[in-house]
Curated annotation (Swiss-Prot):
InterPro entries: 4-PPantetheinyl_Trfase_dom, 4-PPantetheinyl_Trfase_dom_sf, ACPS, Ppantetheine-prot_Trfase_dom. The gene is acpS. One of its GO terms (molecular function) is holo-[acyl-carrier-protein] synthase activity. This is Holo-[acyl-carrier-protein] synthase. Mg(2+) binds at D8, E58.
Length: 118
């Protein structure tokens, strides 16, 4: 049974402005593994990756119903499976989780569905 669904839409240029003012912003949002992937990319790809992880994590906290505050960005990790699809590899949710991240132009959208294991 679906117990939560969260959606987030983010402008990549807004993330770029924050990142330009404070490059440590990436360290606040990304886990160590996510940060290692981020640092392997050229600048423009870094921005879309960072915006995608931001949006995915925002969608997750909307789905679980806590918002950022009770959870931190470090409590949630989004990596890619062998096919390159994003997966939630770390979160406090014990059921099944499904994530989709899409980029189009200056926008990134993420959707997270949480499902009870029952």
């Amino acid at each position: 049974m679906i117990v939560g669904h969260g959606i987030d839409l983010q402008e990549i240029s807004a993330i770029e402005k924050v990142y330009q003012r404070n490059p440590r912003f990436a360290q606040k949002i990304l886990t160590e593994q996510e940060l290692a992937i981020f640092e392997s990319f050229p600048y423009k790809r870094r921005l879309s990756y960072l915006a995608g992880r931001w949006s995915g994590k925002e969608a997750f906290v909307k789905a679980i119903g806590t918002g950022i505050g009770r959870l931190t960005f470090q409590d949630i990790e989004i990596l890619n499976d062998v096919r390159g699809c994003p997966i939630l590899t770390k979160s406090p949710f014990k059921g099944n989780s499904f994530i989709s991240i899409s980029h189009s132009g200056n926008y990134v959208q993420a959707s997270v569905i949480l499902e009870d294991k029952k």
